[in-house]
Every structure is written in C-alpha cells, then in structure tokens.
Amino acid sequence: METKQFKAESKRLLDLMINSIYTHKEIFLRELISNSSDAIDKIYYKTLTDDSLKFERDDYYIKVVSDKENRVLKIADTGIGMTKEELENNLGVIAKSGSLQFKKENEVKEGYDIIGQFGVGFYSAFLVSDDVTVISKAFGSNEAYKWNSKGAEGYTIEPCEKEAYGTEIILKIKDNTEEENYDEFLEEYTLKSIIKKYSDFIRYPIKMDLTKTKPKEDNKEEFEEYKEEETINSMVPIWRKNKNELKAEDYENFYAEKHYGFDKPIKYIHTSVDGVVSYNAILFIPETTPYDFYTKEYEKGLELYSSGVLIMNKCGDLLPDYFGFVKGIVDSEDLSLNISREILQHDRQLKLIAKNIKTKIKNELESLLKKERDKYEKFYESFGRQLKYGVYSDFGSNKDILQDLLMFYSSKEKKMVTLAEYVSRMPEDQKYIYYAVGESNERIEKLPQIEGVLDKGYEVLYFTDDIDEFAIKMLMNYKEKEFKSVSSGDLGIEGEEKENTSSSDDKENKELFESMKDILSGKVKDVRASKRLKNHPVCLANEGELSIEMEKVLNAMPNNQNIKADKVLEININHDVFKSLKEAYEGDKEKLKLYTDLLYNQALLIEGLAINDPVEFTNNICKIMK
C-alpha cells in the first residue's frame, strides 16, 4: 500500500484551513452532511437524464453513527459514491471540489442545486479527527476503495469490500485536551443539536440511532435502554412551501421554534424572488422590544442559508441598522461563498438581496400603518425610536425612506399622528411644522412657550424622546414645510407684532432689559419682551441650531463638554410681574436683581434645567415672603 502526497501545498494549506477558515469546530458535521447531500443529488440528476433509472426517495438518506467506546464517528450516505480516480482527484487535491466540477458540466434542473462549491469542506473533518477514512463505491461500479489520511503528510488508497454504492466517512475522534472537549462530538444530544442547527433543511433524511428507555418486560418498575432509528432533520423548510398552504399558526410556530422571541410576531413577510438574484425569505416584525435591543450587546441580522444549509447565524449585512429589529431567514442558491461556508463574501448578490429586503420591510410597515393602525402604533411604541435613529444616522441619508413611518403625539389629538396627517390639516397661513420638546406630553402641555402657537390655532407636535429633535434636525423639512421649535427666537407667525409687543414697547423697556441682561451676564444672550407668552410671566427661548433640549441630552452623555445653547429670557410685559420689575428698576436696584434672578431660575426649572445655586434660590424666595 503506497502513501501518496497531496497535490497542493498540503501542510500549509491544511493548517491554514483548520486554524483560520473555520472558527467553530462543530461545522465539520455540517460540511460532511452537505457533501453527502451533494452525492445523492448527483444520483437524482442521473435519473433526470437516463430513462432507465428511477429515483426512489426512500432509498436515499444520510446516517450518522456514534461509537463512544471506540471514539469513532461515521457519516454514511447512499449517494453516487466515488471511483478510485475520483477519490484521488477530489480528496487528494485540497481546494478542489467535485461538486463544483459537476455543477459546471451539467445543468441542474427542477430546483435541485449542488451545495458544495469548494473542496475544503471535507477537510474540516481534521478539526475533530487526526485519522480520517473514506470508504466509497461508485454508482454502477463493482469495485470499492478505502481512502485514509492522518494529516497533511499524505494519504493512501486501497481496494476494499462494500456491498452498496455510496460513501462512508469514518472519523477517529481526537482525545480531549486542556483547551478542547472532543467527547461532545460523540454524544447523541450534541450531534442531534448540530444537525438541527445547521442541516435541518437538507432535503434528504438524516438518520441516527437514538438511545431510549422502556420498562422491562419481567419487571415494569425497572427500565432498560434500547436504540431506535429516527430522522433528525425537518427536510422541507417552511420558506419553500407554498404560501397558500400555510396558516398564520404555521408562521407563529416557526417563530417560536427559532426562539426569535417570547411574543407573537406583529407581522410576517414570506417572499420568493426570482430575477437577477433568486432567494426565499421569511421575515418577522416583533411585537415587543428584546430586553437588550437598545444595548451594545444586541446583534442584528438574519439567518442566512445557501440551499438549505445554514451559512451564518446572524448576517448583519442583510439588514440596515434602522430595521435591526426584524428577525427571520434568507435562503439563496445564488450566493458566492468563499472557501468556507462560514464567511460570506460581500458580493453583489448579497447587496441585491439586502436592498430588496429593505424595500419589502418598508412597504410592509407602510401597509401596516395604513391598514392596521392599532398594530402599527403598538409596533411603533417598541421600535419607533430605532426608526428615528435611522433618520438621524448617516447624516440623514435615510430620511426619504423613513420619514413617512414617523409618528408623534400632538396638541390636536391624544394619539400619535404622522407628518403627512399633520401637514394635510395645516391652515393656509401656517408656514412651519411646530414642535415642542419635553419629558412627557403633560409637561409639554404646560410649557409657557406653547401658548402663542396654540392661540393661533396651530397644531404642535410633542417630542418626548431624546432622539426626536436630533432626527428632525436631519429631516429639516417635510413636503417643503420646515420644522420650527416653539422655543425658537422667531416663531414666524404672521401678525405677531401687532397682537403682542409693539416696537415702541421694546424701545420703552430697552434700559430695563439691558439691566436684566447685565445681571444675568454670561447666562443669557438677551432679555426681551415676549411675543408668545399669554398667561405665564417668563420663559426661555433659544437662538441658533442648538436647542435647550439638545443641550440637556448632550450634557447627559459621558465625557460631555458642558455644551450650552444660546438662551434668551423672554418677559411677558402684560403680566403683573412685569409691573413689579419696572417698579424695582425705577426705585430699588437690589430688588431688581432679586426679581431677575428669581425669574431666570423659574425659567430654568420650567425647562427642566438645574439651578446653579439652589440655596441662593430658596433664600431669595424667603426674602420675598418676609
């Protein structure tokens, strides 16, 4: 028996493959089962081109057998088998794939696709074994051969006995080390779990003899073990079934089986696409937020299959971050894989699938909003924040995709409204989309700044999420209507000059406001008569792009830089408090300072900002009460 050398740079390549390409040892079983499936596919293909042959499905299967005592694991199939020449060509050359060659030479028909595209899958056996034997008998041949290798040094091929055609791969499992427990690859439970995880949708039965117990015949109180053959895999994936044959319950059961969440999905999308790229997908929109969704630990992504074989547990490239809440699977035969099924190339097919999926999700959410408003609002309570992050991120490049999905509470109704609904009912004289920012709807309703806008009969959107205003700054406008905060220095309301403070009033109180500005030096940019206040004596407005609420959010972040918005103290000159200010200005400068500090701190409290010196503030209140 002659030992032959591998025809590639065997040692270096084999070491590279074992140590670098595959990051999880358990995938060896996935690779070997996929090869077995390919071998049966080749038999099926022959029956399509040879009328004298018949394909009896029950005759074709894959068997996994564990022998713990001898530390042997066997994977057998009833596939096409290999001749001596094929054993040498396919297994003697690392990185040569018989499946790939077969695929090139033959046109695969009727939805059957050869899974294997590269020749290193078989060599993943060396992840768990340092003694690999292959016994194979080719279809239509009377001769069988045994191929054996103990690593990169080479291999042997010799004749052997085998009754039926097909292939057996026999692995002598490695002994345990301090770093690795190889015993688990002989355990029934582990093997069954790996098959379910990676190969559940291989289209041929994967069988195992499972250990079970039953009462002894002579003593029912005692139990004995016995073996029973079971098919481990489901074979037909739900996404390849006819949608008309499936019920909502089938999708909900699949959602639960895949452990996508403890809730029921609020919506599912089952799609089959044929075109430039072909794929099947089932996508789920959850009802509730996963506990870790808004943390760094959360990992987005869809399960990615190639011809029913799991390639990646979470393929993040298939989902944009703003749709990261979507769960589900994608299965495609068009994906280009590199030499391991674990790592996917960032190729054109994947990008096309991702683009298509993004559009599908967007359309489904828009449909949900229009046709099932209650469901959409429930979804939005859980994931609306993520959509707003999507608008804000990437410098607003996704705003056109997401803007019609946004919702906010408003002064008009006690429920959420869309931007389209807001704009559709704007009065003709209203130039802007007005919004107010606060911790809650109740707090916003009490804001002094909102009075002037509401008095004009204009609707105000309520921003209660810290991301809201940042997202709107990126959105900039909606249907050519700009957004305007009720705290803006200029509200852009027609006729506000006539209805409130006249220019003569501003001139008359100029010296008073200058004195108050000096008292608050460094704290406010200006003090002026308010054009928005009706019932309240004072409020803070802001000038520039940075609002007071944005200041609060940014300063609450780690490593804040003490960012400050440009604030303006606005005084209601029609309020009784203003009379007290004028009297103090004319007769008691100390009292003017006292009143000014009190009003400024009052305005800070209304905005939810911290008072610089609470003790001084309380002392000032006590002075007034004496």
From Swiss-Prot:
Describe its partners and assembly state. Homodimer.
Please give the chief subcellular localization of this protein.
cytoplasm
Name the record gives this protein: Chaperone protein HtpG
Outline the segment boundaries, as ranges, of region: Disordered.
490-509
Region (C), start-end ranges: 553-626
The entry's keywords: ATP-binding, Chaperone, Cytoplasm, Nucleotide-binding, Stress response
Instruction: Spell out the GO cellular component terms annotated for this protein, sorted alphabetically and separated by semicolons.
Output: cytoplasm
Which HAMAP family does this UniProt record tie to the protein? HSP90
Gene of this entry: htpG
Residue numbers spanned by region A: 1-341
